[in-house]
Amino acid sequence: MESTKKQVSLELLPWLVVHTDGTVERLAGTEVCPPGLDPITGVFSKDIIIEPKTGLSARIYRPFSIQPGQKIPLMLYFHGGAFLISSTSFPSYHTSLNKIVNQANVIAVSVNYRLAPEHPLPTAYEDSWTALKNIQAINEPWINDYADLDSLFLVGDSAGANISHHLAFRAKQSDQTLKIKGIGMIHPYFWGTQPIGAEIKDEARKQMVDGWWEFVCPSEKGSDDPWINPFADGSPDLGGLGCERVMITVAEKDILNERGKMYYERLVKSEWKGKVEIMETKEKDHVFHIFEPDCDEAMEMVRCLALFINQVEA
């Protein structure tokens, strides 16, 4: 009797496997939870459609404490997952957004961009750009009634931080009347062919991350593609970053740690006229705040992000 078990064509661990018939089986980030009232923070959320043609959706959040007529900052959030996994309804992200919205007192729009390999890059960037440029046109009451569009922030973790970086450039170069107040980049997913920092000693992990990127964005440039390496040939000069303020957070044990620090250093030395700050969390690894939301370090990071958005010195 012939086995009905699917044969594996490609393993991209720990995220997914691709079977010989072309189907993609994700191994992480597939759990979902509904929107609604969060009993712990009092934050309300609901799912909305941004672009009916593509099915692009988002989960929007508003704090409990908001008053009629009150205007508060608007935060577009982009989740991580190496452009391969996760969603706005992934329980850990939903919990994280509830905490950020409660602490920072913002209207948040968590963008559910489409994932590779079914939707190869630059689809994630295009979806995120669609969400940003159409944020007013969708005619969402929570945005119309409560969001201060002059206080617009782009925030993301890992791949989502990478997206925030690119959107800040695109918004400045476009003819859209978009003014981004600041971007928050949590453990940004930047990479490069030449290893630096911990990448030099941890060859196995370096090769693994190389493989992730080559899978979602196959090109002759590899990890020196401007999408992933902001300092590679063809990347826009950081002096042209289209926002007033930047906050970068890195984690000591994260393989991406040195990339985030390098971004900070290069931005400081550039012609950019804004204000940048960096925060390093000791003894923690990549996106720890998503998987340990109640640890002291995660709560401190959320507190500092809230201060950044509300222009208060930590």
UniProtKB/Swiss-Prot annotation:
Which InterPro entries does this UniProt record tie to the protein?
AB_hydrolase_3, AB_hydrolase_fold, Carboxylest/Gibb_receptor, Lipase_GDXG_HIS_AS
Write out the residue ranges of the motif Involved in the stabilization of the negatively charged intermediate by the formation of the oxyanion hole: 79-81
Active site as annotated: S158, D254, H286
The answer on whether this UniProt entry bears the keyword Transferase reads: no
Q: What tissue specificity does the UniProt entry give? A: Expressed in roots and flowers.
Q: Quickly give the catalysed reaction.
A: a carboxylic ester + H2O = an alcohol + a carboxylate + H(+)
What Pfam families is this protein classified in?
Abhydrolase_3 (PF07859)
Enzyme Commission code: 3.1.1.1
Transmembrane feature ranges: none
Cystine residue pairs: none
Please tell me whether the keyword Hydrolase is annotated for this protein: yes
Entry keywords, A to Z: Hydrolase, Serine esterase
Q: Which PANTHER family match?
A: ARYLACETAMIDE DEACETYLASE (PTHR23024), CARBOXYLESTERASE 2-RELATED (PTHR23024:SF577)
Q: What does this protein do?
A: Carboxylesterase acting on esters with varying acyl chain length.
Q: What is this protein called?
A: Probable carboxylesterase 2
Record gene name: CXE2
